Swiss-Prot record:
Residues 1-27, 352-375 are annotated as: Disordered. It is found in: Cytoplasm, Cytoskeleton, Microtubule organizing center, Centrosome. Its main location: cytoplasm. A motif (CC1 box) lies at residues 76-80. It comes from Xenopus tropicalis (Western clawed frog). GO terms for molecular function: dynactin binding; small GTPase binding. Belongs to the BICDR family. Keywords: Coiled coil, Cytoplasm, Cytoskeleton, Neurogenesis, Transport. This is BICD family-like cargo adapter 1. It comes from the Eukaryota.
């Protein structure tokens, strides 16, 4: 009984180790088979021991052995059959898995070959770029070395120039000490000449004081001139204003004269008309008196008249009435004329309306009776005419008074013009004085120029004495020393400029080199990041494929392993960019591990 169970356990171990995917299904069959074996063993052990005796026991033991052998044979047959079926299933599944594995391996080999080709292309490109950058860096390093060599040479030249300049400075200091001694001697001579010059400058100081006094007088006169010019400008403005007033008054006077002339003409016409009216009035009064006398005579002779006389009287009465009507009409016309004259003299706007009313009244008076004419209307009109004439005469008197005022203004203008003339004369006098002072200043200027000429002559004499006192050799040495110093200073400035240019070039080259190094670092970082990304992609694909392969056999083993792999994949997916170096290292380790497992 123990041999088949051990055989089963030994045979199940390689199957479980080789094919993990079908472990659950096979485990169920093994459990059923074990249960049957246990059941058979229990049946064999549970036989009754009621038969007594040795023979019976032997027979029973033989029977038990036979039965046990039969059972073992049956079990062996069943087990062989089960094992054959299981081996067939396992071989079939193994062939299928082997096919799938070969297909997947071919696919992975193709992908691996493509990725290798891409990686080689990219590596070739980056190597070319890196080689270019390295060549650029080499060129820049060579240029930097050249610049450093040039700088060293420039420093050497600078040191040599500084040494030469220091030697020249020492020489110049010696020459300066000699020159100071010469200057002391010359200063003594200059002091002597200065004393002589002071004696001559005393006379010039007197001239200068006189010039200052004249300048003060000129300032006073110029101030006076400005004040007079201001007064003249104010007077001229007032004169212009007065001239404007005079012109306005003259215009007003002309207009008033024209009005007076027109009114004089109107007065003359009105006076002539009044005289004519008076003559007509006297004639009318004479006619009225004659008519009254005739009337009185007719009343006296009325008693003694006859029919013929009555007829004649009636005819005469009609004629008298006609004459009276004519007289009344003439009186009315005279009244209208007087009223029109009054209206013209007043200058009212209602003159036209009055004339129109008068004309209408004339027309109505011709048709109406003579009783409509007022009794004292002519006298009132004449009185109005007299009052108007008196008012016109008064206006003429006022115009004459205005003329007197205009005459006064003209006199004031004449006085202002005389004052302006006097001011102009004063200005002319001041200008003459200014000219005199200017002439005096010119004379003083001439004297000053003469003094300056004398001073120049004295300076020339002093220079001549200095030239005589100085030695020709010392002067030449001084000139040479000054020239050498100037040349050394110019050389020093040129060298400093060249050094500054070299420093600027070196700084620019350093910046270019730093930029190139920075670009190289950036490119190397990009290349590393790209390599890490490629490794990560390859690792991810390989891990996915292996997970698919491992998930097909036994589920009990693959569950825990699958969970671990999923957690690793999730951790790799959710990893951030800043940790690229650690992720790349882990990916490389996983890639090497997977390669080893694959081999």
């Amino acid at each position: 009984m123990e041999l088949p169970i051990s055989f089963l356990s030994d045979s199940s171990r390689p199957a479980a180790s080789s094919e993990r995917g079908d472990q659950a299904a096979l485990g169920r069959g093994e459990l059923e088979f074990d249960e049957e074996l246990v059941f058979l063993a229990a049946e064999g052990e549970g036989d009754p021991e009621e038969i007594e005796g040795p023979e019976v026991r032997e027979q029973s033991e033989l029977l038990c052995i036979i039965r046990q052998k039969e059972k073992d044979l049956v079990l062996a047959a069943r087990l062989g059959k089960a094992l054959l079926e299981r081996n067939q299933d396992m071989s079939r599944r193994y062939e299928e898995m082997q096919r799938e594995m070969t297909d997947k391996l071919e696919h992975l080999e193709q992908e691996k070959h493509e990725l290798k080709r891409k990686l080689e292309n990219r590596e070739g490109e980056w190597e070319g770029r890196v080689s270019e950058l390295e060549s650029d860096v080499k060129l820049l390093q060579e240029e930097l070395e050249k610049q450093q060599v040039n700088l060293r040479e420039a420093d050497r030249e600078k040191l040599s120039v500084v040494q030469e300049l220091s030697e020249q400075n020492q020489r110049l200091l010696e020459q300066l000490s000699r020159a100071t001694e010469m200057e002391r001697q010359l200063s003594q001579q200059v002091n002597v000449l200065q004393e002589e010059f002071r004696e001559k400058s005393l006379s010039t100081s007197q001239h200068v004081s006189r010039l200052e006094s004249l300048l003060a007088e000129i300032k006073m006169l110029s101030d006076r001139k400005r004040e007079l010019e201001q007064q003249l400008s104010t007077i001229m403005e007032e004169n212009e204003q007065l001239q404007g007033l005079v012109e306005e008054l003259q215009d007003k006077e002309l207009s008033l004269n024209q009005q007076n002339f027109g009114k004089d003409l109107q007065l003359r016409e009105s006076q002539l008309e009044i005289e004519e009216m008076r003559l007509s009035y006297r004639q009318l009064e004479g006619k009225l008196e004659e008519l009254r006398e005739e009337k009185s005579l007719q009343h006296m002779n009325s008693t003694s008249t006859s029919l013929l006389s009555e007829i004649e009287q009636s005819i005469e009465a009609e004629e008298q009435e006609q004459e009276r009507e004519q007289l009344r009409l003439q009186l009315w016309e005279a009244h209208c004329q007087v009223r029109s004259l009054c209206c013209q003299l007043r200058g009212n706007e209602s003159a036209d309306s009055a004339v129109s009313t008068d004309s209408s009244m004339d027309e109505s008076s011709e048709t109406s009776s003579a009783k409509d004419v007022p009794a004292g209307s002519l006298r009132t009109a004449l009185s109005e005419l007299k009052s108007l004439i008196l008012s016109i005469l008064e206006t003429c008197d006022s115009a004459s008074s205005r003329k007197c005022e205009d005459d006064g203004l003209e006199e004031q203008i004449k006085q202002t013009s005389e004052d302006s003339r006097a001011l102009r004369e004063l200005l002319q006098g001041e200008q003459m004085r200014m000219k005199q002072t200017f002439d005096e200043l010119q004379e003083l200027h001439k004297q000053v120029t003469l003094l300056s000429v004398e001073m120049n002559a004295l300076k020339e004499e002093r220079d001549r004495l200095l030239v005589l006192t100085q030695n020709d050799e010392t002067q030449e040495q001084l000139m040479k020393a000054i020239k050498d110093r100037d040349e050394a200073i110019s050389k020093k400035t040129a060298v400093e400029l060249e050094l500054a240019k070299c420093r600027i070039d070196l700084m620019s080259l350093n910046t270019q080199l730093l930029d190139a190094i920075q670009q190289k670092l950036n490119l190397s970082q990009q290349l590393e990041a790209w390599q890490d990304d490629m490794h990560r992609v390859i690792d991810q694909q390989l891990m996915d494929k292996h997970q698919k392969e491992w998930s097909q056999p036994a589920y009990s083993f693959s569950n825990s392993h699958h969970v671990k792999q999923c957690s690793k994949a999730a951790a790799m997916k959710h990893a951030e960019r800043p940790g690229e170096e650690s992720i790349g290292a882990e990916g490389r380790r996983l890639f090497s591990f997977l390669k080893k497992t694959k081999c």
